[in-house]
């Protein structure tokens, strides 16, 4: 089961201000309690972030993000590997109300349990994925801005 994401949302700060907040990687686990492990040092090209995510389901997802391209304050694109693999991209653009943020990704499970779960219970896997994204945006607004 491949999970594709194409989401856009508005945040009430200018792109440069938003980028300054997003670049504070040392605060990620404070903002996002479901991010159980994070060892990233910077939002910069050629960085590797190790992550463990706990959705509201009885499993954790462990993966790394290799930041391939980073263009401040506009975009970051990374290759994902581990329990899931694929790519993800964050793009930030100006909007009259602040910043237009777009997240796109194509991810697929490599872990045997997640592959089986994706085949047998695709809506549950999608729920977990969507829950993490929804929580991330909500908690970023509440805790980072």
PLM feature spans:
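Short, surface-exposed charged micro-motifs
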Residues: 8, 39, 66, 87-93
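Intrinsic-disorder/low-complexity, polar/charged segments enriched in Ser/Thr/Lys/Arg/Asp/Glu/Gln
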Residues: 2-8, 48, 62, 75, ...
């Amino acid at each position: 089961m491949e999970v594709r994401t194409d989401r856009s949302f508005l945040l009430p700060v200018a792109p440069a201000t938003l980028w300054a907040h997003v670049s504070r990687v040392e605060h990620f686990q404070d903002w996002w309690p479901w991010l159980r492990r994070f060892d990233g040092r910077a939002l910069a090209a050629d960085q590797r972030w190790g992550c463990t995510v706990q959705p509201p389901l009885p499993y954790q997802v462990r993966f790394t993000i290799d930041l391939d391209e980073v263009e401040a304050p506009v975009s970051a694109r990374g290759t994902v590997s581990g329990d899931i693999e694929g790519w993800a991209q964050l793009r930030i653009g100006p909007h009259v109300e602040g910043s237009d943020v777009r997240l796109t990704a194509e991810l697929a499970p490599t872990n045997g349990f997640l592959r089986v779960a994706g085949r047998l219970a695709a809506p549950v896997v999608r729920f977990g994925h969507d829950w993490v994204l929804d929580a991330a945006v909500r908690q970023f607004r509440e805790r980072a801005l």
